[in-house]
Every structure is written in structure tokens, then in C-alpha cells.
């Protein structure tokens, strides 16, 4: 028995050598799983865990409104309406689009080194032109638009402005500058609308004033040419003079009749008769001046004078109406003025809102597993089809 032991041990050792070694679980993973799940997840873990730069978002909110008639709203919108203002939704969209426009960016770059904010900070994947391939202005504008977001709440009428950059203070500065630009745009819209509203009324006033000047000059020229300054007053004066002459004529006739009756040969009779003839002549002249057929008679001048006078009066009334319309236009323009009210000032964030590191890593893992599952099913289906 002692001689057989070495043989048995040798046989057992040889059998153990023939057994295959167990593969580790890592080696059991298919290349497809490595490509779709492990490698992307590791890259995501390394990037978001160690290299991805923090990005800070400064937030502010504002509303554009005008003192128009109120409408029924709920919540904060009703509170804003209670102050006597109505929302100007069309204009708030205009302000929002302007804040993200090239014109706004050009104005912003005059006071802040915006491109430097986004080109010299942050990791290569996050900052603008991180690999030096696209440095055009159009490329920077498209990048910048993704850093400025505006959300509009149709219920309350409030817009929220979010500006993201790699530095909290820089985000706040850009946000503040954009709010000032929005306010400047509103003032520009107000000035233009007011000018358009008032311009027509001012032109009407100018035209009416020219008509008054022309009509007044025509009336003055007519008065000077015809010696008539107030036809009605002059007619009243002449009629009063005729009345006095007629009264005096009656007195003279009475005296003359009395003298003739008492003393027919009285020497006063010729004088009274001469005075009677003189009065009759004067009365006839005055009556002809008032209603005679001559061109200079008041009756003939009345129609022309009345026309010129009425033209002057009408022109003055039109001027007064135009002035009233101008004042009404100014009041209406003031009533339609727009106002940009800042609800909350730009914040100075002390916590980075982006990137969402854990979320991105987990999302990469889940997406990789989904892709792996789909590709595995496709591969198995193809193999089964071939078999």
C-alpha cells in the first residue's frame, strides 16, 4: 500500500490540472456590453465627477404692463391688475426676443467682456470654442443664446430671466444688464408710440393755425379796404344817427307848423324850412349808406363781410377743436405707456445649478443599458434568422 500512494497522488494532480479554470465576471462580459454600458458610464463618471465645470444661474423676474382697462386674472396676475395696470403680453414677448437677439448681445459687449466670460473659463466641453475649431461670431451668438433663457407665465404675466455662466457674479452682471436693456427698449417703444399718436394731431393743429392766420388776414384786409371794422356796430351807429335826425326833423316840422299857424310871415320860417330840408337830405344820405345800391353801402358790404367774418370764426373754432384733440391724443398716449417692473432682482447664486452630476452619470448608465438590450435583441434575432 505504501508503494501505491505516490502513484495515486500523481494521478490526482494530473486530473486537477486538466480541469478548466473559472473565468472572472469581468471577462464574461461581452464586448457589446463594454462598448454600450461600461465605457460610456466610466467616461461619464470621470468627466462629471472630476472635470465638468460648475455653472451658476442668476435668476430675475419682471413684468411689462400698461395702465389700460383691467381684465379678470387669478393669483399674482390679479394682484398686479389691482394696482391699476394691465398686462401687455405682445410687448413682453418683444422684450424677451430682444434680450436674446444679436442687437442685445452687441450692446452687452460694449459694457461687459461677455465672450471672455464664456471662452476663457470652464472645461473644454462646456466653454465656448473649447477645442479652437469654431471661433466665429455667429457660433458665439448661438452659444450665448443657450445661456440666456426667458420663461413667460401666461397666467400671472410674469417673465423669468435665467442667465448661466461659469461665475456667479458674472451671471448676475449679465442679468442686470439685460434688464436695463429691456427697460430701455420699453422706453424706446413708448417714445415711438407717443410720437406716432401725437404727430397727426400736431399736424392738424398746425394746419388749423395756418387757416386762422389766413382768415384773420383776409378779414383785416377787407376792413382796411372798405373802412369797415365792425359792420354790426357801424350799422347800429348809423341807424341811431338816422333815428336822431328823424326825431330832430319831427321837432322842426312841429315848430314850423306852429309858427305858420300863428304868424305866417314870421322871419323864422325860412330858417326852419332850410333846416328841414337839410335834415331830410342828411336822412336820405344815411339811409342810402345803409341800404342804398352803391358798392360802399352797408347792405351791399354785409354779405361779403359776413362771409369773411364767418371764415375767420370757423377757422378759430377748428383750431380750438384741433387743440382739444391734441390734448386728448397726449392723454391717450400717456395712458398707453408701457412699464417694465422688476418683480425680483437678479440673484447671486452661491450653489451651482449645473451640471447635475449624479443625474447625468445615472442617465448615461440607464441609456447604455437600454442600448445594450436593444442591440442584444437585434443580434440574437439576426443569429436566429441565420440558423
From Swiss-Prot:
Give the function comment from the record: May form an ATP-driven capsule polysaccharide export apparatus, in association with the CtrC and CtrD proteins.
GO terms in the biological process aspect are: polysaccharide transport
Cell location: Cell inner membrane
The superkingdom listed in its UniProt entry is: Bacteria
4Fe-4S found in the keyword field: no
Q: Which organism is it from?
A: Neisseria meningitidis serogroup B (strain ATCC BAA-335 / MC58)
Membrane as a keyword of this entry, yes or no, is yes
Question: What family classification does the UniProt entry report for this protein?
Answer: Belongs to the BexC/CtrB/KpsE family.
Protein name, UniProt field? Capsule polysaccharide export inner-membrane protein CtrB
Topology of the protein relative to the lipid bilayer: Multi-pass membrane protein
Q: Which InterPro entries match?
A: Bact_polysacc_biosynth/exp (IPR050445), BexC_CtrB_KpsE_VexD (IPR005705)
Amino acid at each position: 500500500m505504501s508503494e501505491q500512494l505516490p502513484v495515486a497522488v500523481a494521478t490526482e494532480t494530473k486530473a486537477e490540472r486538466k480541469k478548466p479554470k473559472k473565468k472572472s465576471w469581468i471577462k464574461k462580459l461581452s464586448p457589446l456590453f463594454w462598448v454600450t454600458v461600461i465605457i460610456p458610464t466610466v467616461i461619464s463618471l470621470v468627466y462629471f465627477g472630476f472635470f465638468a465645470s460648475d455653472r451658476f444661474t442668476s435668476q430675475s423676474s419682471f413684468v411689462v404692463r400698461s395702465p389700460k382697462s383691467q381684465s379678470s386674472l387669478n393669483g399674482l396676475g390679479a394682484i398686479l391688475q389691482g394696482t391699476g395696470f394691465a398686462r401687455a403680453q405682445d410687448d413682453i414677448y418683444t422684450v424677451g426676443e430682444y434680450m436674446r437677439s444679436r442687437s442685445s448681445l452687441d450692446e452687452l459687449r460694449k459694457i461687459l467682456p461677455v465672450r471672455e466670460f464664456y471662452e476663457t473659463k470652464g472645461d473644454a466641453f462646456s466653454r465656448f470654442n473649447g477645442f479652437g475649431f469654431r471661433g466665429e461670431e455667429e457660433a458665439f451668438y448661438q452659444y450665448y443664446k443657450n445661456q440666456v433663457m426667458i420663461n413667460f407665465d401666461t397666467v400671472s404675466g410674469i417673465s423669468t430671466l435665467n442667465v448661466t455662466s461659469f461665475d456667479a457674479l458674472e451671471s448676475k452682471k449679465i442679468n442686470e444688464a439685460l434688464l436695463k436693456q429691456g427697460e430701455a427698449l420699453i422706453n424706446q417703444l413708448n417714445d415711438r408710440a407717443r410720437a406716432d399718436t401725437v404727430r397727426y394731431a400736431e399736424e392738424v393743429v398746425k394746419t388749423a393755425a395756418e387757416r386762422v392766420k389766413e382768415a384773420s388776414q383776409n378779414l383785416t384786409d377787407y376792413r382796411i379796404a372798405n373802412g369797415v371794422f365792425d359792420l354790426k356796430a357801424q350799422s347800429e351807429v348809423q341807424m341811431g344817427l338816422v333815428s336822431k335826425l328823424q326825431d330832430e326833423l319831427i321837432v322842426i316840422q312841429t315848430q314850423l307848423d306852429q309858427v305858420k299857424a300863428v304868424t305866417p310871415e314870421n322871419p323864422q320860417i325860412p330858417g326852419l324850412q332850410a333846416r328841414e330840408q337839410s335834415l331830410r337830405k342828411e336822412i336820405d344820405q344815411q339811409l342810402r349808406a345803409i341800404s342804398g345800391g352803391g358798392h360802399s353801402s352797408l347792405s351791399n358790404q354785409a354779405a361779403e363781410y359776413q362771409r369773411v367774418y364767418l371764415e375767420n370764426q370757423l377757422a378759430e373754432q377748428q383750431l380750438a377743436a384741433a387743440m382739444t384733440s391734441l390734448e386728448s391724443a397726449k392723454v391717450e398716449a400717456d395712458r398707453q405707456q408701457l412699464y417694465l417692473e422688476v418683480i425680483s432682482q437678479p440673484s447671486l447664486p452661491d450653489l451651482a445649478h449645473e451640471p447635475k452630476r449624479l443625474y447625468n452619470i445615472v442617465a448615461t448608465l440607464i441609456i447604455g443599458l437600454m442600448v445594450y438590450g436593444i442591440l442584444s435583441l437585434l443580434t440574437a434575432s439576426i443569429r436566429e434568422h441565420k440558423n
